[in-house]
């Protein structure tokens, strides 16, 4: 029997674009859940299988999901209501939805949580731009979609992509604030904090400036480690989160990041996401590229920096057919952001297939 093409060629995935709206958080969640019910249930079940393969029992991942959802309710009741609506609309209980929404936090229960994303940015007045690869299991290559979210009163419309069941992930809002995500790892990581994907959703919906986004991130009691890169037309700020502590990285011109801590003040307890991580090799590849690169004329100029030769298993990553299908990692999407031009482009697969 032939394998589904996405297991070896994620760029061939037909990505759905959906418009999500509702009169309140819960109603918007219900609308999302009903519209995408089958895919939301499939994604939740896929994460349950992943956790089982990693040795996380059903009771443990459910307890972790509930703890993270409780933290989300304390931090932002509206987002908790939206998550409850998504679950109801999709025919899941809330803890089952939490296996997706809090999957980053749940994976802190294993010694080698995978995720190998690479981000490149350029800061200049009126023309800051950013791009990233999103690397994940090839088995989840069909578990994400583009979206356009209609704002509630006091919110901003936003566009980008998310996984089925999450209200937000990576994107750009109508105020010109964008956000990227890279996973980091620290010895104190654990489940139970606000899910980082809930934080991303709030930034996209509510942040009117880069400074507001940074303060939202710093206000969230997260228990896992991540890099959240906030992009506006005039500035780029990378926020490293180490299980509750934060550090900011910012400078004019080029700034790149992969999956290990760069801030000196967060080195105590810093770890690789996986002993086999390529984070240092990918950072070196990006730094070599920006070393001779002129200021970008547009976000398309960032794409070549991400286009490492696929056979190198570096920034641009194809599934390894020699590995078991469920273990294959790959670049599932490439994201380009240009806040000044109100542009966010999300394309499936390695950056070689991204629009210039």
Q: What feature does the model see in each segment?
A:
Residues 102-194, 198, 332-335, 344-346, ...:
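Internal mixed beta-strand/loop scaffold within catalytic domains of large alpha/beta enzymes
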Residues 246-253:
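Acidic, Ser/Thr-rich peripheral helices and adjacent loops at domain boundaries
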Residues 201-205:
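Short, well-ordered beta-strand elements within core beta-sheets of diverse protein domains
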Residues 1-116, 206-227, 232-238, 242-243, ...:
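C-terminus-biased signal that marks the final domain/tail of proteins
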């Amino acid at each position: 029997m032939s394998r589904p093409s996405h297991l070896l060629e994620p760029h061939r995935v037909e990505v759905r674009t959906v418009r999500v709206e509702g009169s309140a958080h819960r109603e918007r969640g219900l609308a999302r859940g009903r519209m995408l019910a089958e895919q939301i249930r499939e994604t939740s079940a896929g994460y349950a299988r992943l956790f089982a393969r990693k040795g996380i029992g059903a009771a443990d991942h459910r307890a972790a999901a509930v703890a993270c959802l409780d933290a989300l309710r304390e931090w932002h009741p509206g987002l908790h209501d939206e998550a409850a609506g998504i679950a109801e609309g999709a025919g899941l209980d809330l803890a089952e939805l939490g296996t997706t929404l809090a999957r980053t936090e749940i994976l802190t229960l294993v010694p080698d949580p995978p995720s190998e994303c690479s981000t490149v940015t350029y800061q200049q007045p009126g023309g800051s731009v950013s791009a990233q690869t999103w690397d994940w299991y090839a088995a989840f290559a069909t578990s994400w979609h583009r979206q356009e979210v209609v704002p509630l009163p006091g919110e901003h419309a936003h566009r980008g992509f998310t996984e089925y069941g999450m209200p937000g992930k990576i994107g750009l809002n109508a105020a010109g604030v964008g956000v990227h995500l890279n996973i980091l790892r620290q010895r104190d990581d654990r489940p139970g904090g606000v899910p980082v994907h809930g934080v991303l959703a709030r930034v996209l919906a509510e942040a009117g400036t880069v400074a507001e986004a940074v303060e939202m991130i710093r206000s969230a009691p997260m228990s896992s480690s991540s890099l959240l890169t906030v992009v506006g037309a005039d500035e780029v700020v990378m926020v490293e989160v180490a299980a509750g502590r934060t550090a900011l990285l910012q400078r004019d011109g080029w700034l790149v990041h992969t999956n290990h801590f760069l801030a000196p003040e967060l080195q105590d307890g810093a770890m690789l996401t996986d002993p086999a991580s390529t984070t240092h090799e990918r950072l070196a590849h990006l730094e070599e590229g920006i070393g001779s690169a002129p200021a970008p004329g547009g976000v398309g100029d960032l794409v070549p920096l991400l286009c490492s030769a696929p056979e190198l298993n570096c920034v641009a990553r194809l599934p390894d057919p020699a590995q078991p299908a469920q273990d294959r990692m790959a670049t599932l999407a490439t994201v380009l952001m240009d806040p000044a031009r109100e542009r966010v482009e999300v394309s499936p697969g390695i950056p070689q297939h991204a629009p210039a």
